[in-house]
Structures are given as C-alpha cells and as structure tokens.
C-alpha cells in the first residue's frame, strides 16, 4: 500500500458513518467492510498513533482543531471503537496473504468473516473474550486456527467467556478438535455444509448447547453428546448426511426439532430412537428411502412417543388422528423399556432352546412371554391384604381409581374402555398368581442340510427387590401389565394375519424352486444361530425365506443387480470340509453393506442349483446393464430452463457438484475464492440457466402420446412400456379384447386409459366383419401415464387434467412471457388466466385463446400453434380491455359460458367453457379481481350469476314442446349442455332407403379439449343438447352476445339440427375409461331405421346427468327400468 492514504475512500466511509452511525451503534445495522478498505483505515490510525494503539478506549493525540482530515479521522475512530457488529469480506481478486487488523474495534460483540483466511486476521485476541457471535464463511479448514490460536495472533488457548453462537457453515472442515473445550457458554453451533465424517466425543464438552446444525456433511452416525447438553438441546439438524440409524437420539429427552431428511434410513425399524422424545414437535424424514414406502406416515407414527405424537409436525404437516390410530395396524407398537432396576427375564416355565432366524431378523419386538417382569413371591395372607384394602380411606381408593383411569386413557387413547372390563375381570389374585406357560412354538424343520448346535439363551438371575415392602404387587400394576400383554397379543395377531396376505403375492410369483443357501459375511455365516435359508427368485425380487415358518426375511430388488460371480469356497458341512459353490451378487445400493451379498449353495445338487439361478439372473443383469448404459448416455444431455431446448454438453463449463464428485475425493469448495468463469450456455438462446435434461421414462412407464393426426404405427407391439389395445364394442355390455399385452400393460393405479373413435377405419372394419351389426364401431384405447396426458410439451395451463382448478397458478414460462411481453402498465400485476374457446362478437367461429387477467386489464391471446417452446411462437395478442371499461359480467345458461361486455366500442366476448366448475371458479376469480377496483367503477358493472329464462329467450320455443299444453310464463324444467356431436346411421334391411349420414354436413374442426380429442371428439361438431320432458334437441348456436341487446335475441341465433323423442331411445352406453363420452342408440319404429348419437362433453359429471334426465320420462313411457350399459374398457 502507498504511504499516502486515499482521501476519497476515507471520506466515503466517514459519510456512511455520519448517515447511518446511530443504527450501527444500536446494533440494528451491521457495519460491512471490504478488507482493503479496513486496511486503509487502520494504516491511517497507525500513522496518527506514533506509539501504537493502546488497549482501552483511545483518542487521537493533540492536533490542530481546525484540521478537517484530523477531525474526520477522530470521528471515524470514535465510531469504530463503539461499533458492536462487524462484517469483513475478502474479495476474490485480493491476495491470500493479506494482513487485516481489527484493533480499532474495542466494543465488538459480533464478528463475521467471509472468504478471509484466519491467518490474515490480526487483533482477534483483544476482543475474543467479549465476542458473543462469531461467523466464518468459506475460509476455515480447522476449528483450532480460529478458536485456539485466534487467527494470525497465534495466542495461547484461553476460554471464550461469552460466546454463545458459532457459525462455521460452508467451510472445508473434515473433523472436530479439542478447541471446543474453550467454548463453555456456547448455545448455538452451526457446522453445516462441511465435510465432517465423524464428531467423536468433542461435542460432549458443550454443556450449554441448545441448537446444533450438522446438515450437509458426511456423518454416518448420530453425534455423541454429554448428559449436560442432552438435557438442554432442543434443535438438532442432521439432514443430507449418510445416517443409517437413529441410535443416540433416545438420550435427548427435550429435543423439539429434529431434521433427518435426505439420509439413508431404509426401514421404519431404524427409528426406534425416537420413542423417548416426549417433547418432539417437528420431525423431517423427507428424502429417505423409507419416505417412499406405502403408509409412510402411519408407520412413522408408531415409533413416536405417545405423549408427543398428537402435536408432531411430520415433514411440515401435522399428524392426523387417523394416522395415529391406524399406526397400530402396521406392526407392534414401539414402547419404552421400564427404567426400574428389576431385571427382565422369563420365569414362567421351561425355556426354549433357541429361536429361529425369522424371529431374529424380523423387525418386531419380543413378545410378552420373553419380557415378564420378575416379581418376588407374596407370602402375605389373603385376609391381610383384604384387611389393608378395607382399612384404606374411601378418598384414597377413589384417588387410585382416578389415577388408574387416567393411566388407561393416556396409554390407550380413545379405545381404552374396551380393554378395561376384560382386564379388571382377570385381576383375581388366583388368576394373577397362576403360572403362565409360554405359547406353543412351531416345530423346527425335520430336515436340515447341516447340523448346527443350538445354544441355550442365558437366564439372568432375578435381582432382589429394592424394598422389602414391595413384595405385594399392587392391583394397578397388575392391571397395567395385563393391559400391555393383551394389547401386544392383539397387535401380534393383526401382524401375523396380515403378513401372509402381503407375502403370498411375492412367493406365488417365484420362477424356480427354493434353493438352500447360507448367507456369508466375512467368511462366516451371517446368522450363526440359524445359518441356512431358502433362496427364491421372482420377476422383480430376490427373496431370503425362513425355512421354519416360510416368512420372507430379506427382499432385494433385482433391477438394482449389477454383477454376478461364481467360485468355489471351502465349507465345513456335517463335520467334513468340502468345496461348495459360492454365488456373489453385486447390487447398486447407497448402503455399503447392501452392495454385495454372498451365498454358499447347500442344496443336494449344488451345481445344478447354481446353473438354475444363473439362467434366471443373467438375463436380468444384461437388461439392467443395458438400461444403465442408456441412462448414462442420457446424462450428457442438457436442457435450457428458458427455451427448453436440449443439447449435448460438449464444452467444459467447470466442475459440477454431484455426489459422484464427493466419492472421488473432489473438493466441492475448490474455487471458493475465485469467480466462476464457465461458459456453458444454451446454443439456441444463449441462456446460462441450464440443467441436466430429464431422463426418458423406461421400464414400466408409458411412452408419450403420438399426435392426433398421425397414423398408428403398423406392426408396433407397443414396446417400451406402451400398452396399446384394440377393442371391438358390440351392443353387449362386455367387449372382446383382440390384442393384449399383460406383461407390459401398466396397472390401473399407474395409468389412465384414453379413448378415441376411429372414423377412418370404419368402412374397412364393417367390410371385414360382415356378420356383426353395422351399429358398432371401431375403437382404439391407449394406456398412457398421467404425467404425459396432454400433448403440450409439459405445459400446464388451467384448466387441464393434471392441474388444479386454481386459475391463479400458471406455468412459469407463460408467466415470464406475460410479465415481459404482455403486461406493460405501471404497477400492473398478473392475477389469473384460463385457456378457453373464445367467441368475439362479429366473428363467425370460436377460437382457442388464453384469457389473462391483471389488476388493470383483460388480455385475449389467440393460440395459433402447438403449445411448446417459446410462448411468442404460439400466442398472438389480439386485444386487451381495461377493467374499468367492463360494463357487463354475466354467467351463461346453466353455467356453461361467461359473457364479458365492454363499454363504448370495446365489444363483447363469450368464454365458452362447456364446464360448470370451470366457469364457476373463473367467475369467482374475476369477482376477486374486480373487488380491487375503486367503488365508482364497481357500481357501473352489471352482473348476473345465471341467465334468466323468459318467453323472449332463444330456447323458449323448444321448451313448450308438449302438444296441447297451455302456454305458461313459468320456465319448465330442462337440461342444457354444450357438447360435441357425431351421428352414426345404421342401414336396416327392412328400410326403403338408407338414411343420410350427418357427418358430411358438419364441420370437422372444433375446439374440443385435448382430453375430449383423445377420447374421439376430433371429427365431432360443436352443438348444444337440450333435453326437455319429452324430446331431445341438437341445436346449432353461434353464441353471439351483444351487451346492448341483452333482452333482444339476434335473428337466426339458434338452428335445430335434429329432434328425437325420448321414447325412441333403445340403449345408452357409458365408458369407464372415457368418462367424457356418451353413446345413445335410437330406433324409429315408423321408419324402421337405427341411428346413434355420439356425444362428448367437457365435464365427466355431465354424462351421468344426461342419463339421469333421460331416465324419468323413458321409464314413464315404458314402465320398466332404464338401465344404461357401462363398458369397463
């Protein structure tokens, strides 16, 4: 540094202190300085102190009072000496060897260092004893260099007396050290985002610790804590580590917040350490393997303390009462062991020699027979105990009754009453003192490949009672023990009854006979007490089964199989040592102990058994390796978040932080002190916001849906997970399946069946199937995963099958386009939008549009192409109207449309939703937006929530359809549904001439939703169905609506296309897999011809509603039940 201090820098710092000095001194603001700036200031003070800075509060030596620089320096010195909080940032361009002295800060309470190496800091020794908060980011590699050596001061280790918060997150710490012994008052410790693999016993010295954050490290076990800090610790964060168990958490009785998300917790049995956390309020387990299990929340609830389960937030959501009550149905209840000194042993008869392998490895607690409490024999006379009981005051007996009732209610919840009468009846002393024999055990298998001596379980000697007065067991204790035993027997029975049902499906699908093997670990049997098991292979799993009970001991997924090796290993069998086949299987698993499994084959013909296993496992291995190679190739593809373009990353844009880099020993914090200069960008738009492209679904997932205009591929059997089926539907209820693929068809819960009507192949199908009725048609069904239902390139614009009916939610790409290209007003904010067919007054046809509403305007953007890529490519803004010019807002007939009228020459629009729920929700959103306008504009808007039916209404002539009925001004009952219609005529051999098909007279283009198009509405015409008491009408409407002529209908606005009496209906067909489709068969007895109305609605509820409307008049006509035909496909 030059000897002359930069005057401008000093003036700028003095100006900042003048303006914000009061907030800096009271602690509401933190003084943040770059290290070069602080170095300039300290050198200025060193020049003004010829003898060097002192220890206490100081003033500058005598100087001319009229010198402005001196007065400015004195002011800065006074401010810095009183500053309580300081933040030092070391720029990346500055050298690493850069001394920074903090001697001017005499009153420092909080210090934060960013990217400043500790050895460059001077003066920490003079303030360490008064520091309360110390924070170091991206600069520390060991605790000792800061806490024990005080950075560059290299002082001797002295205690930090008042330091209560230490934040060393985002550093390169690999282990802890003994310097933590100097932090006697520490309450908050944050060591997250480091590389710590183990904590050892260094945290035991922190007796005042209340908050501990060790997230984003490499811990494999819960850190050890002392008795002092376990009593005070209330928050423990261990997320993003490698924990495989919760052992050690049981010693934290006051813990309230526990975060174990994104670890390696595989089974719920590993949560046993949570049972003693009676004060737990928040628990996070998201991202663990057990998180993805079925009934995850209920299974987790059974491992929580019953005192805390009612108030626990599991993954941010409160446990419901049903989840807590149903937890008992998924396994035995995890209970705390009694803390008394009495030793638990079995004293009720003969002991069994050993236990089976199933009992040892099954995740359940020992049954009651193995945990009967040792009681000293009572030698008191029965009359004595009765005399003592009779001599007790009535108040004392009543108090004990209340305590016993409270204990029942606390332990068993709402169901405690069902246990009490039964258990109190068993409290007879003769029944209590009667010896109980253990329940019968299943006999072991009569044959075994090797004789293994069974070891008897040691019986601990019962300890003497702690007090001679405790010889008599109180009735309350007997009642509680009987309640526990009864509850355990009940839960065990539920578990035993449920397991065979769950395992039956897996065992039933075995591909080979059981093979007797011995699981080997480190050259020895994995379970010495019962070394051999049955090995079975199914289509998806490798099963280890208990040979005694036939239960599944271990289940491994074969899709994670990565390697197979066979060899010979010496093995001692029946006292003779011989070489037996050794089968080694490698699996892809996050747990190291599950990556490799070894089996010694002990069958009578081991070579033949190994050959059978290899024949089954090798094809699975080849499939797994092939899929892994394909997925690795997909990992090289990148995707742009802005334009969604996919490309291959051929430019080295710098290191990518990934779990693989950690396993290879890469430093994720390398380059913390330098700027990132990677040049990886999107080749299409140049954006730097790129991610790894999502992998293409394989295996059992469905392939994307082909475009509607494309022809189905010839000879394609639907490989790759596509389950395509062709069905022939006759007038019968059941349809015959002509082609199926049961192995590749997804389950009903995983896929949705979409329906489409094949109009092009209709003539060919009729020519080929001359024996079938011409009334039937050809249909194609396609199974498709729900996530890829719409052919919109992943866009979700409400309303849609995969989105909610909250029109305020919008795809982020469309939201960005609206904010940048459409909304241009001052303080204009987006409110809601809907994709809907729009009809503008004066236009002939309807068109698809996105209607976007802000707090100032309504925008109409026409959809001109396929929804994909940049919104500007398929959206064309056509008009915008101010909300203040809105004059009328009316809901259409029976809530199927919404009419907007604007004052002046603004025109009118009809939003033809054809869905009551969509219209109702969007109308509510519109009212919420209009409520934000000033009151003077709201008074000018005419609103109506339903369209009135008067004699001037356009549909009134069709409603008075009963011949001879008197004219009435009261609107009759009717059903009105805008839908899509397709007519199918059937030629009868008795008819004089065939009926003309109406398809040629109807337009082939419509605005049906993608869901309706997939179900066959591509060739249907947009009409309106009107159902009265006697007839059905198909009406063609132009939906033109002019606000100024609300009560005067436009001429020729409604034309009747077809009219049919309800009595002509012969059958009605519904389809479970095509809920928008309805098929009505008609038969005209006068003309002796048959026809069919094929209808598609935009609301699945409307099809059932149409059927119910037709039921009453049809049954009144024929006096028989009206039963629609429902097709399962």
From Swiss-Prot:
Region of interest (Disordered), residue spans: 335-392, 428-475, 654-678, 696-724
Entry keywords, A to Z: Cytoplasm, Leucine-rich repeat, Repeat
Ranges: LRR repeats: 107-128, 130-150, 162-183, 185-206, 208-229, 232-253, 254-275, 279-300
Low complexity compositional bias, start-end: 448-458
Biased amino acid composition, Polar residues: 337-355
Basic and acidic residues bias: start-end ranges: 381-391
SMART domains: LRR_SD22, LRR_TYP
Subcellular location as annotated: Cytoplasm
Biased composition (Basic residues): 365-374
CC annotations in GO: cytoplasm
The keyword Iron appears for this protein: no
Cytoplasm recorded as keyword: yes
Compositionally biased residues, Pro residues: 436-447
Similarity comment: family membership: Belongs to the STK11IP family.
Name of the molecule in the record: Serine/threonine-protein kinase 11-interacting protein
Lineage: Eukaryota, Metazoa, Chordata, Craniata, Vertebrata
């Amino acid at each position: 540094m030059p000897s002359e201090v930069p005057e401008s820098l000093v003036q700028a710092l003095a100006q900042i202190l003048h303006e914000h000095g009061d907030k800096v001194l009271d602690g509401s603001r933190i003084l943040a300085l770059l290290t070069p700036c602080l170095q300039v200031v300290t050198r200025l003070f060193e020049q003004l102190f010829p003898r060097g800075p002192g220890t206490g509060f100081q003033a500058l030596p005598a100087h001319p009072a009229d010198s402005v620089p001196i007065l400015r320096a004195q002011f800065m010195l006074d401010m810095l000496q009183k500053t309580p909080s300081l933040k030092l940032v070391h720029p990346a361009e500055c050298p690493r060897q850069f001394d920074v002295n903090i001697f001017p800060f005499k009153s420092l309470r909080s210090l934060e260092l960013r990217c400043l190496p500790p050895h460059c800091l001077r003066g920490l020794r003079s303030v360490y004893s008064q520091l309360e908060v110390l924070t170091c980011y991206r600069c520390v590699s060991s605790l000792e260099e800061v806490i024990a050596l005080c950075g560059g001061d290299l002082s001797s280790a002295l205690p930090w007396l008042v330091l209560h918060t230490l934040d060393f997150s985002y550093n390169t710490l690999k282990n802890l050290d003994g310097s933590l012994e100097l932090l006697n008052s520490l309450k908050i410790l944050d060591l997250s985002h480091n590389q710590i693999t183990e904590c050892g016993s260094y945290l035991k010295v922190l007796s005042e610790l209340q908050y501990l954050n060790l997230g984003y490290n490499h811990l494999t076990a819960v850190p050890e804590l002392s008795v002092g800090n376990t009593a005070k610790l209330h928050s423990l964060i261990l997320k993003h580590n490698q924990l495989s168990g919760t052992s050690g958490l049981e010693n934290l009785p006051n813990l309230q917040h526990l975060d174990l998300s994104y670890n390696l917790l595989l089974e719920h049995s590993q949560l046993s350490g949570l049972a003693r956390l009676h004060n737990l309020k928040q628990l996070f387990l998201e991202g663990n393997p057990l998180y993805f299990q079925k009934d995850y929340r209920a299974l987790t609830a059974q491992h929580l303390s019953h005192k805390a389960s009612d108030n626990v937030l599991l993954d941010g959501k409160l446990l419901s009462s049903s989840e807590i009550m149903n937890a008992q149905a998924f396994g035995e209840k995890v209970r705390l062991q009694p803390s008394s000194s009495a030793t638990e042993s079995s004293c009720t008869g003969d002991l069994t020699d050993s236990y089976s392998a199933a009992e040892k490895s099954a995740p359940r607690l020992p049954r009651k027979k193995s945990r009967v409490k040792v009681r000293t024999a009572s030698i008191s006379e029965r009359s004595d105990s009765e005399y003592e009981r009779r001599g007790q005051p009535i108040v004392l007996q009543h108090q004990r009754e209340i305590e016993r009732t409270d204990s029942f209610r606390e332990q068993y919840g709402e169901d405690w009453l069902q246990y009490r009468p039964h258990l109190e009846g068993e409290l007879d002393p003769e029944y209590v003192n009667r010896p109980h024999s253990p329940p019968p055990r299943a006999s072991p298998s009569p044959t075994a490949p090797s004789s293994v001596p069974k070891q008897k379980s040691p019986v601990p000697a019962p300890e003497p009672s702690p007090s001679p007065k405790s010889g008599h067991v109180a009735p309350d204790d007997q009642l509680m023990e009987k309640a526990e035993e009864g509850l355990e027997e009940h839960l065990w029975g539920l578990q035993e009854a449920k397991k065979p049902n769950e395992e039956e499906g897996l065992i039933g699908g075995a591909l080979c006979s059981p093979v007797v093997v011995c699981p080997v670990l480190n050259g020895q049997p994995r379970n010495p007490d019962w070394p051999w098991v049955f090995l079975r292979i199914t289509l998806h799993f490798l099963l280890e089964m208990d040979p005694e009970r036939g239960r599944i001991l271990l289940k491994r997924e074969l899709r994670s199989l990565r390697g197979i090796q066979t060899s010979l290993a010496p093995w001692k069998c029946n006292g003779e040592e011989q070489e037996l086949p050794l089968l080694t299987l490698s699996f892809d698993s996050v747990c190291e102990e599950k990556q490799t499994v070894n089996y010694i084959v002990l069958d009578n013909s081991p070579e033949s058994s190994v050959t059978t296993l290899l024949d089954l496992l090798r094809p699975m291995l080849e499939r797994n390796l092939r899929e892994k190679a394909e997925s690795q190739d997909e990992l090289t593809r990148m995707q742009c978040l802005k334009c969604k373009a996919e490309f291959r990353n051929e430019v080295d844009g710098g290191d990518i932080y990934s779990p693989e880099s950690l396993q290879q020993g890469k430093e994720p914090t390398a380059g913390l002190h330098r700027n990132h200069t990677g040049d990886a960008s999107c080749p299409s738009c140049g954006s730097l916001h790129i991610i790894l492209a999502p992998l293409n679904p394989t295996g059992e997932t469905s392939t994307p849906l082909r475009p509607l205009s494309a022809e189905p591929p010839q000879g394609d059997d639907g490989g790759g997970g596509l389950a395509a089926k062709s069905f022939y539907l006759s007038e019968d209820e059941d349809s015959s399946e002509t082609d199926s693929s049961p192995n590749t068809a997804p389950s009903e819960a995983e896929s949705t069946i979409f329906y489409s009507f094949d109009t092009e192949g209709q003539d060919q199908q009729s020519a080929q199937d001359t024996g079938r009725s011409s009334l039937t048609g050809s249909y194609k069904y396609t199974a498709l995963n729900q996530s890829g239902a719409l052919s919109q390139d992943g866009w979700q614009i409400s309303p849609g099958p995969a989105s909610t009916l909250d029109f305020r939610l919008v795809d982020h790409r469309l939201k960005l386009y609206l904010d940048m290209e459409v909304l241009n007003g001052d303080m204009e904010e987006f409110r809601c939008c809907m994709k809907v067919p729009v009809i503008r007054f004066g236009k002939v046809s309807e068109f698809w549009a996105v209607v976007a509403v802000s707090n100032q305007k309504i925008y109409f953007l026409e959809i001109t192409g396929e929804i994909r890529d940049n919104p500007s490519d398929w959206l064309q803004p056509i008009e915008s109207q101010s909300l203040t010019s809105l004059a009328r807002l009316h809901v259409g007939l029976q809530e199927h449309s919404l009419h907007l009228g604007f004052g002046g020459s603004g025109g009118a629009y009809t939003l033809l939703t054809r869905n009551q729920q969509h219209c109702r929700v969007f109308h509510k959103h519109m009212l919420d937006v209009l409520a934000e306008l000033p009151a003077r504009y709201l008074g000018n808007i005419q609103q109506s929530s339903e369209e009135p039916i008067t004699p001037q209404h356009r549909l009134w002539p069709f409603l008075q359809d009963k011949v001879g009925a008197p004219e009435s001004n009261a609107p009759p009952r009717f059903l009105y549904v805008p839908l899509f219609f397709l007519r199918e005529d059937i030629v009868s051999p008795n008819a004089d001439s065939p009926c003309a098909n109406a398809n040629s007279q109807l337009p082939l283009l419509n605005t049906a939703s993608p869901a309706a198009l997939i179900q066959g509405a591509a060739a249907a015409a947009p009409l309106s169905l009107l159902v009265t008491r006697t007839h059905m009408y198909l009406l063609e409407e132009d939906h033109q609506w002019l606000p100024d002529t609300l009560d005067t209908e436009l001429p020729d606005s409604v034309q009747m296309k077809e009219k049919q009496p309800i009595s002509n209906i012969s059958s009605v067909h519904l389809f479970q897999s095509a809920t928008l489709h309805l098929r009505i068969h008609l038969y005209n007895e006068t003309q002796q011809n048959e026809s069919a109305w094929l209808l598609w609605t935009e609301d699945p509820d409307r099809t059932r509603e149409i059927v119910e409307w037709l039921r009453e008049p049809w049954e009144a006509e024929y006096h028989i039940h009206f039963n629609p035909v429902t097709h399962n496909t």
